[in-house]
Swiss-Prot record:
Modified residues (Phosphoserine): 415
Keyword line: Acetylation, ATP-binding, Glutathione biosynthesis, Ligase, Magnesium, Metal-binding, Nucleotide-binding, Phosphoprotein
Cofactor note: Binds 1 Mg(2+) ion per subunit.
Amino acids binding substrate: 125, 148-151, 214-216, 220, 267-270, 450, 461-462
Keyword Metal-binding: yes
Binding site for ATP: 144, 305, 364-373, 375, 398-401, 425, 452, 458
Role noted for this protein: Catalyzes the production of glutathione from gamma-glutamylcysteine and glycine in an ATP-dependent manner. Glutathione (gamma-glutamylcysteinylglycine, GSH) is the most abundant intracellular thiol in living aerobic cells and is required for numerous processes including the protection of cells against oxidative damage, amino acid transport, the detoxification of foreign compounds, the maintenance of protein sulfhydryl groups in a reduced state and acts as a cofactor for a number of enzymes. Participates in ophthalmate biosynthesis in hepatocytes.
Gene: Gss
Organism: Mus musculus (Mouse)
Pathway assignment: Sulfur metabolism; glutathione biosynthesis; glutathione from L-cysteine and L-glutamate: step 2/2
Protein name: Glutathione synthetase
Taxonomic lineage of the native organism: Eukaryota, Metazoa, Chordata, Craniata, Vertebrata
Cofactor(s) essential for the protein: Mg(2+)
Coiled coil: none
Signal peptide start and end residues: none
Length: 474
């Protein structure tokens, strides 16, 4: 996938000057992170790592990813409303994965008590890579769907101007015009605003559940600012704040001090390390409340790796989406090979195949946040330890996607510009809002491209491996 600026990657002096201009433009545009040394303060900030140039993405696959996003929104919504499917699918996982089990316990408790909320909000991001066939053909294959704390919609809204600037500096104005406009933060805020409106209390606020040490605060502020522009106030709080200042009234309306909360937006709570006993109690209070949760715990469970694997089984999509054969076909076309590791013949066979050809598989736990997957020799060692243990049910196996590498220049604070062979991962942001049984909003709202050096098997921007990027349609 050649581009017209490939030769510049070999000109060290020109690259150095371009990198300076790109970094200054990124800072001016607000492509920012708090510093690693001061993650609780905005007194010292730096630019978020990014590519010097946009990266080539096949136009047809970009269009396909956008076209299927509303189907994925509907699928997540359908799964979240199907307690029998969730219980059956996660039954083996929750026996050996304490984190998923705690989430599921809260889910069951709220179901038993009766769900108070009537407005349901999904802000999802479906992530893909581009499988390269032996004949050079490219195919869109889903890596995962993120249903909680899908990040970088704010910073992704600011990077197109940076790459247009770089190409304009090179007098490549035609190429600069091909950089797609992109504003996920606006679309995410529209979903939150619709849920807030349907909640029906003009004085209620949005509660953003955040970490105390948050380097990626400007990404979150982008959504907050969009809401404030719509006269919707956002308050930030940690789980600890909910425990200390939160309460439910007799109608299960949620209050922080004396402020009623219409929507709870989680930018924390997606990893086991983010919970202690106090935080679990806070999560239960939030789930029991009438406030719209983004996500509620059913939507979070719908985004687990085990659910993703089960959805690939023959007939499952048809059962969950009856009478929608076109949507089923679009969804299934994006599925990579996914394999259960539950105890039994099917799991035994999957492990045997992975041990025989480890370069073709990835071992995935039920975790979000990046950097959790196992590849190659690490995967082999883990499977050898797990193969006779019921603990293997807390993992799934996935076919390893093999994209076509390309060259780009990675820019990171405190490091020299790095010209390397790269691969990219494309994310599409989706928003849906349901009131009762009526879907009142379902749309795609933008994209995120993250790029990393080929030698890194796993890890995103927050994990320090990937960098922000923009698709250059080819």
């Amino acid at each position: 996938m050649a581009t017209s600026w490939g030769s510049i990657l070999q000109d060290e002096k020109q690259l150095e000057e371009l990198a300076k201009q790109a970094i200054d433009r990124a800072l001016a545009e607000g492509v920012l992170l708090r510093s690693a040394q001061h993650p609780s303060s905005s007194d010292v900030v730096t630019y978020a790592p990014f590519t010097l140039f946009p990266s080539p993405v096949p136009s047809a696959l970009l269009e396909q990813a956008y076209a299927v996003q509303m189907d994925f929104n509907i699928l997540v919504d359908a799964v979240s409303q199907n307690p029998a499917f969730l219980e059956q699918t996660l039954s083996s996982t929750i026996k050996k994965d304490d984190y998923t089990a705690r989430l599921f316990d809260i889910y069951k408790q709220v179901l038993k008590e009766g769900i108070a909320q009537t407005v349901f909000l999904g802000l999802n991001r479906s992530d893909y890579m581009f499988q390269c066939g032996a004949d050079g053909s490219k195919a869109l294959k889903q890596i995962e769907i993120n249903t909680i704390s899908a990040s970088f919609g704010g910073l992704a809204s600011r990077t197109p101007a940076v790459h247009r600037h770089v190409l304009n500096v090179l007098n490549k104005t035609k190429e600069a015009s091909k950089i797609l406009s992109n504003n996920p933060s606006k679309g995410l805020a529209l979903g939150i605003a619709k849920a807030w409106e349907l909640y029906g209390s003009a004085n209620a606020v949005v509660l953003l559940i955040a970490q105390e040490k948050e380097r990626n605060i400007f990404d979150q502020r982008a959504v907050e600012n969009e809401l404030l522009d719509r006269k919707i106030h956002v308050i930030r709080g940690r789980f600890e704040d909910v425990s200390e200042r939160g309460s439910l009234d007799q109608n299960r309306r949620l209050f922080m001090d004396d402020q009623e909360v219409a929507v709870v937006y989680f930018r924390d709570g997606y990893m086991p390390s983010q919970y202690n006993s106090q935080n679990w109690e806070a999560r239960l209070m939030l789930e029991r409340s009438r406030a719209a949760k983004c996500p509620d715990i059913a939507i979070q469970l719908a985004g687990t790796k085990k659910v993703q694997q089960e959805l690939s089984r023959v007939g499952l999509l048809e059962a969950l989406l009856p009478g929608q054969p076109e949507a089923v076909a679009r969804l299934r076309a994006t599925f990579a090979g996914l394999y259960s590791l539950d105890m039994g013949e099917e799991g035994d066979q999957a492990i045997a195949e992975a041990l025989a050809a480890p370069s073709h598989f990835v071992l995935k736990p039920q975790r979000e946040g990046g950097g959790n997957n196992l590849y190659g020799e690490e995967m082999v060692q883990a499977l050898e330890q797990l193969k006779d243990s019921e603990e293997r049910a807390s993992y799934i196996l996935m076919e390893k996607i093999e994209p076509e590498p390309f060259r780009n220049c990675l820019l990171r604070p405190g490091s020299p510009a790095q010209v390397v062979q790269c691969i990219s991962e494309l994310g599409i942001f989706g928003v849906y809002v349901r009131q009762g049984t009526t879907l009142v909003m379902n749309k795609h709202v933008g994209h995120l491209l993250r790029t990393k050096a080929v030698e890194h098997a796993d890890g995103g921007v927050a994990a320090g491996v990937a960098v922000l990027d923009n698709p250059y349609p080819v």
